[in-house]
Amino acid sequence: MTLNLCVLTPNRIVWDSDVKEIILSTNSGQVGILPNHAPLAMALDIGILRIRLNDQWLTMALMGGFARIGNNEITVLVNDAEKGSDIDPQEAQQTLEIAEANLKEAKGKRQTIEANLALRRARTRVESINMIS
């Protein structure tokens, strides 16, 4: 038995295919979803979506949003998403280093919050690559 997973951003469909299992990063921790899961709606944090296709696991970096589960269908609406396999490791590492430097240089509450968010996004992208390496 499978689940239909659809991952959407405001600009595109990132994924629309059947999967065996997924693990989502929510605001209250990780949640695993298997076929016949109870209906559920949840807020998603910046984090990694793990997707199991048969015996293979894939990753996707999600930049926060919402998920709805019901009738073996999962709809994930996020601000942005990238498949781990599509992320350039060197570019992601450079972005992480820049985000770390920007956090150290941040002045004031607003700059610190924005720098922390950028750092979380950059870390998620790097972790998404490292999980598939």
Curated annotation (Swiss-Prot):
Cross-referenced Pfam families: ATP-synt_DE (PF00401), ATP-synt_DE_N (PF02823)
Keywords assigned by UniProt, alphabetized: ATP synthesis, CF(1), Chloroplast, Hydrogen ion transport, Ion transport, Membrane, Plastid, Thylakoid, Transport
Entry-linked SUPFAM superfamilies: Epsilon subunit of F1F0-ATP synthase N-terminal domain
GO molecular function: ATP binding; proton-transporting ATP synthase activity, rotational mechanism
Membrane topology, from the record: Peripheral membrane protein
Cystine bridges: none
GO CC annotation: chloroplast thylakoid membrane; proton-transporting ATP synthase complex
Function: Produces ATP from ADP in the presence of a proton gradient across the membrane.
NCBIfam families documented for this protein: ATP_synt_epsi
Protein name according to UniProt: ATP synthase epsilon chain, chloroplastic
Species assigned in the record: Lotus japonicus
Gene symbol of the encoding locus: atpE
